Amino acid sequence: MAKKSAIYGEYVVSVKDDGAIEVFRNYDNVKGSLREIAESKGFAYDPSWNTQQFGARLIKEFGEGSEAHVDNYVIVKKDNGHIDTYRTYENTKEALRSISSATGFEFDSNWTTRQMGSKLIDFLNNLNNK
């Protein structure tokens, strides 16, 4: 569960219950993200596969059941067959800097990841409410 969160484009920034900051990217272009995942692992694929076929094959190769974790990527097959992909970030502060740069959010380089994440969430929520 998250104490607070904000969405910017494909990115979600959250303050978790323990105060840690989490950033993930929920891909709009799922097939493109599946290609990115496959290529990062040297997984051969057929360009004619649809998103459901592609996702199911990657899950079979790298996961189990309806989910696969491939490095920082997660592939999920929903009950209706729909495939979702998202990416987490090892370097949370770098992801926060990237989002800050894209949104015009000015930050203090001395802020901790928790400070920066919390303030960025407030900024994004204010931006979204305008």
For each predicted feature, which ranges?
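Acidic, low-complexity, intrinsically disordered interaction modules
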Residues: 16-20, 24-57, 61-109, 114
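Short, surface-exposed coil-to-beta transition loops
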Residues: 7-8, 70
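Short, charge-rich amphipathic interface segments used for partner binding and complex assembly
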Residues: 120-121
